[in-house]
């Protein structure tokens, strides 16, 4: 019984701190790894256009608009064209990035919360601890034992809820 109390607290602490501090970094890191090993044409094209854009911008900044106007105008047109093309391509990449991050976030949510739900389902009949019958009215004892625990005990579901609220209130 004591191991159920402690494991529930530790699991809730892990989930809370993972969501608060590590989830965004994990998702961003996974996306960066995917981009570096991916053969996605849109990602490669976006990177190539960005490299060309930066090269043209560097040349444009090095060229005087008064002394070498023809060269500067040609580079400026090329820069504007690449800039528009990069913006269009970036919109496609942004949609893909948002979808990738949303799917990975859902996977992590299922992984962390799913484990908690599994434990709650598996141990739903196991009481976490018992309360004295004179301490609370009978309806309160019944509510604390929901969904399937023994009357007069605190169920794992109620205990999990209390632990989560306490942790989120403290941290």
Curated annotation (Swiss-Prot):
Coiled coil regions, renumbered to chain: 38-95
Gene3D superfamilies to which the protein is assigned, alphabetical: Helix hairpin bin (1.10.287.660)
Single Gene Ontology MF annotation: protein-membrane adaptor activity
Keywords: Coiled coil, Endoplasmic reticulum, Membrane, Phosphoprotein, Transmembrane, Transmembrane helix, Transport
Main localization, broad class: endoplasmic reticulum
Residue ranges that the UniProt entry lists as topological domain Cytoplasmic: 25-108, 171
GO terms classed as biological process: tail-anchored membrane protein insertion into ER membrane
Cross-referenced InterPro entries: Get1, Get1_fungi, Helix_hairpin_bin_sf
Subcellular location: Endoplasmic reticulum membrane
Membrane topology: Multi-pass membrane protein
Gene Ontology CC: one annotated term: endoplasmic reticulum
Post-translational modification Phosphoserine, affected residues: 65
Cross-referenced HAMAP family: Get1
Family that this chain belongs to: Belongs to the WRB/GET1 family.
Function: Required for the post-translational delivery of tail-anchored (TA) proteins to the endoplasmic reticulum. Acts as a membrane receptor for soluble get3, which recognizes and selectively binds the transmembrane domain of TA proteins in the cytosol.
Protein name as catalogued: Protein get1
Gene coding for it: get1
């Amino acid at each position: 019984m004591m191991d159920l109390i402690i494991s529930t607290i530790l699991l809730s602490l892990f989930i809370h701190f993972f969501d608060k501090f590590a989830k965004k970094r994990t998702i961003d890191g996974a996306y960066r790894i995917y981009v570096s090993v991916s053969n996605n044409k849109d990602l490669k094209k976006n990177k190539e256009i960005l490299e060309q854009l930066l090269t043209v911008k560097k040349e444009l900044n090095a060229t005087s608009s008064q002394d070498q106007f023809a060269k500067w105008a040609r580079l400026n047109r090329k820069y504007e064209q690449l800039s528009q093309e990069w913006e269009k391509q970036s919109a496609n990449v942004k949609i893909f990035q948002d979808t990738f991050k949303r799917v990975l976030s859902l996977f992590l949510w299922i992984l962390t919360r799913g484990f908690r739900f599994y434990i709650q389902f598996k141990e739903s009949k196991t009481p976490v601890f018992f309360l004295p019958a004179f301490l609370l009215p009978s309806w309160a004892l019944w509510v604390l034992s929901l969904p399937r625990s023994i009357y007069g005990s605190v169920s794992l579901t109620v205990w999990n809820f209390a632990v989560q609220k306490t942790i989120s209130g403290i941290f």
